[in-house]
Amino acid sequence: VHLSGEEKAAVTGLWGKVKVDEVGGEALGRLLVVYPWTQRFFDSFGDLSSASAVMGNPKVKAHGKKVLDSFSEGLQHLDNLKGTFAKLSELHCDKLHVDPENFRLLGNVLVCVLARHFGKEFTPQVQAAYQKVVAGVANALAHKYH
């Protein structure tokens, strides 16, 4: 992902304030509620029968944190996202058979959750930088599908 110095500073500056457990759980939970067909990849998570069940599900929260921990790793290697996410791409493609469009959906949901958590601090410029990053991460995760 090509970010200007200003964009990189905006992304990393805000990310330093992100509570990955909270934001990750909310982002994954919202993905599962807003796009219910994504739930089929999470059969082992138990009760996903309603929005409140999804948002309160400890397995959703734990996996959301895991997802954002990986995203954090990607932020350290913006110049090599494909390399950083190669193993995860392979896992999601070959073993889990996740539709790569879901990575784009989750990235967009993450941007919404960040906007909700950071309000005025999440300026249009910060949003634009994050959109570039989540698109780059989604492309890297979809890499093994091509």
UniProtKB/Swiss-Prot annotation:
Modified residues (N6-acetyllysine): 59, 82, 144
InterPro entries: Globin, Globin-like_sf, Globin/Proto, Hemoglobin_b, Hemoglobin_oxygen_transport
Residues recorded as bearing S-nitrosocysteine in the entry: 93
Keyword Transmembrane: no
Annotated tissue distribution: Red blood cells.
Binding site for heme b: 63, 92
PTM sites of type Phosphothreonine: 12
A GO term for molecular function: hemoglobin alpha binding
GO cellular component terms, A-Z: blood microparticle; haptoglobin-hemoglobin complex; hemoglobin complex
Gene Ontology biological process terms, A to Z: hydrogen peroxide catabolic process
Phosphoserine, modified sites: 44
Domain named Globin: residues: 2-146
Record keywords: Acetylation, Heme, Iron, Metal-binding, Oxygen transport, Phosphoprotein, S-nitrosylation, Transport
Pfam name, any one: Globin
SUPFAM superfamilies: Globin-like (SSF46458)
Biological role: Involved in oxygen transport from the lung to the various peripheral tissues.
Subunit structure: Heterotetramer of two alpha chains and two beta chains.
PANTHER family: HEMOGLOBIN FAMILY MEMBER (PTHR11442), HEMOGLOBIN SUBUNIT BETA (PTHR11442:SF42)
Protein name per the record: Hemoglobin subunit beta
Organism: Pteropus vampyrus (Large flying fox)
This protein's encoding gene: HBB
